[in-house]
UniProtKB/Swiss-Prot annotation:
GO MF entry, a single one: oxidoreductase activity, acting on the CH-CH group of donors, iron-sulfur protein as acceptor
EC code: 1.3.7.7
Keyword Metal-binding attributed: yes
Identification of the protein by name: Light-independent protochlorophyllide reductase subunit B
Catalytic activity: chlorophyllide a + oxidized 2[4Fe-4S]-[ferredoxin] + 2 ADP + 2 phosphate = protochlorophyllide a + reduced 2[4Fe-4S]-[ferredoxin] + 2 ATP + 2 H2O
The family this protein is said to belong to: Belongs to the ChlB/BchB/BchZ family.
Gene: chlB
NCBIfam families xrefs: DPOR_BchB
Assembly and interaction partners: Protochlorophyllide reductase is composed of three subunits; ChlL, ChlN and ChlB. Forms a heterotetramer of two ChlB and two ChlN subunits.
Residues binding [4Fe-4S] cluster, per UniProt: D36
Gene3D superfamilies for the chain: 1.20.89.20, Nitrogenase molybdenum iron protein domain, Proto-chlorophyllide reductase 57 kD subunit B
Top-level taxon of the source organism: Bacteria
Length: 505
């Protein structure tokens, strides 16, 4: 446990609550002190839904600490069962209430005797798991609970090709839009969607899952555990390719083709891939246009969760010719997978969940654009570097009302727009400064954590500000390098001119 004012991944109970509130007619009881119950407010603010968040806090107060929690927790579960008539009630502690080391499984057993709904204790160690790993584990637990209720009497495979989509959840990055695009893509391929879980899914729908021909897991962080469980129990194959970008979408479609042909269908999707790539998606055409060619060789950094950071790095490097200076993720638990995915696509790989370190690495790299989370957007504003948000954690502006998928062929169009609009064009930047445009910023001469060993005097700072923005960072970097090599600790006009001569300009 560490004290921080910014976390890229929330605590474990947030992951459990995301899964519970994604299902239809499932209620969550959170055993927690006041202060841990912010999930309701957060979800109500960010998700544009009309229904109340189905989470009740069973508050740990001084009375509970004095005589134990059992009566209060059991009473709250039974009361919610009577008031809401849910199909399932999920009980979860938080990091704080876990310190009490209470036998919550016993509380659940007692509550189950008095409740019509199923009652589950989220099987999560709150000191070992974060939001993403806890969410995946909770989804797997709920899926396995209802599949085991079938006692081996699994439904027969559907006549027509069908698929389950696992991992679409509340508070996910553009998850609702991605789900709609995935459904459309599968429909184009002649595959019906059997069950989407957990978002909008009833727990009774889980028992229909074995009838699908295969499972789709679009995100590395969530759904893979449930898909692997179904693969073991029912033999269903899974596709864990994220169809983000032209190349990966084509790869995803070919994986669907292979699975269907293996199971007796006769399909051929190469013509569909060709027509979508050349005539429907604008991204392939855009990548060959003069506008996109202006981006070739530009320097960018990418940071986010596993799925989006890896996919965005691949799109920038392979589809748009942008040089990725470094790619990073805060998902340290799956670092080896991430390194294997991006090692050949970028100069360096960063595995860190320390926002200060990320900020310093961005400041040192001085990229033309950042692709990251809400925090990197803040960092970019401080450094006057444009940022495109491509991953959670995110704020309200990345829960758009309009249709903004990142997956499939429409997703490629959205990403192309995001990439192009994230780079500041050199002449535009220069003209804004010449004519006193609204984007004019002060010259930044220090790193994010203000640990620079060099000081710029007033005259040198003014001179640096006169240099056009699209070459200013390079001049600043070369001047500071020259000053360090020549043992100077203060940069003056004379040092700037000497650095210019040394560079052969």
């Amino acid at each position: 446990m560490k004290l921080a004012y910014w976390m890229y991944a929330g605590p474990a109970h947030i992951g459990t609550l995301r899964i519970a509130t994604s299902f239809k007619n499932v209620h969550a009881i959170m055993h927690a002190p006041l202060g841990d119950d912010y999930f309701n407010v957060m979800r109500s603010m960010l998700e544009r839904e009309r229904d109340f968040t189905p989470v009740t806090a069973s508050v740990v107060d001084r009375k509970v600490l004095g005589r134990g929690s059992q009566d209060k927790v059991v009473t709250n579960i039974v009361r919610k069962d009577q008031e809401e008539a849910p199909d399932l009630i999920v009980l979860t502690p938080t990091c704080t209430s876990s310190i009490l080391q209470e036998d919550l499984q016993n509380f659940v057993a007692r509550a189950q005797e008095q409740s019509k709904a199923d009652v589950l204790l989220a099987d999560v160690n709150h000191y070992r798991y974060n939001e993403f790993t806890a969410a995946d584990r909770t989804l797997t637990q709920i899926v396995s609970y209802y599949i085991e209720k079938l006692a081996g009497n699994l439904p027969a495979r559907s006549e027509k090709p069908t698929a389950n989509i696992l991992g679409i959840s509340t508070l996910g990055f553009h998850n609702h839009h991605d789900c709609r695009e995935l459904k459309q893509l599968l429909a184009d391929l002649g595959v019906e969607v059997n069950v989407v879980a957990p978002e909008g899914c009833s727990v009774h729908d889980i028992q229909k899952m074995p009838s699908a021909w295969f499972n789709v897991v679009p995100y590395r962080e969530l759904g893979r555990g449930a898909a692997e469980y179904l693969q073991r129990q029912t033999g269903q194959p899974l596709i864990d390719i994220t169809p983000m970008g032209i190349l990966q979408t084509a790869r995803f479609i070919r994986a669907v083709q292979q699975i269907l042909n293996t199971q007796g269908a006769r399909v051929e999707y190469e013509e569909y891939i060709r027509s979508q790539t050349l005539f429907v998606s604008q991204a392939a055409w855009f990548s060959r246009s003069i506008d996109c060619q202006n981006l070739q060789g530009k320097r960018a950094v990418v940071y986010g969760d596993l799925t989006h950071a890896a996919a965005m790095t691949r799109i920038l490097a392979r589809e748009m010719g942008v040089r990725v200076v470094w790619a990073g993720t805060f998902c340290k638990y799956d670092a080896e997978w991430f390194k294997a995915e991006v090692a050949d696509l970028c100069d360096e790989v960063l595995i860190s969940d320390d926002h200060a370190e990320v900020g310093d690495r961005i400041a040192a790299a001085e990229p033309a654009a950042i692709f990251g989370t809400q925090m990197e957007r803040h960092i970019g504003k401080r450094l006057n570097i444009p940022c495109g948000v491509i991953s959670s954690p995110i704020h309200i502006q990345n829960f758009p009302v309009g249709y903004r998928p990142f997956l499939g062929y429409e997703g490629t169009n959205q990403i192309a727009d995001l990439v192009y609009n994230s780079f500041t064009l050199g002449m535009e930047d220069h003209l804004l400064e010449v004519f006193g445009g609204h984007d004019t910023k002060e010259v930044i001469t220090k790193t994010m954590t203000a640990q620079s060993d060099l000081e710029w005097d007033e005259a040198a700072t003014r001179e640096l500000a006169k240099i056009p923005g699209f070459v200013r960072s390079k001049v600043k970097r070369n001047t500071e390098k020259f000053a360090r090599e020549s043992g100077r600790d203060k940069i003056t006009l004379e040092v700037m001119y000497a650095a210019k001569e040394a560079a052969g300009a």
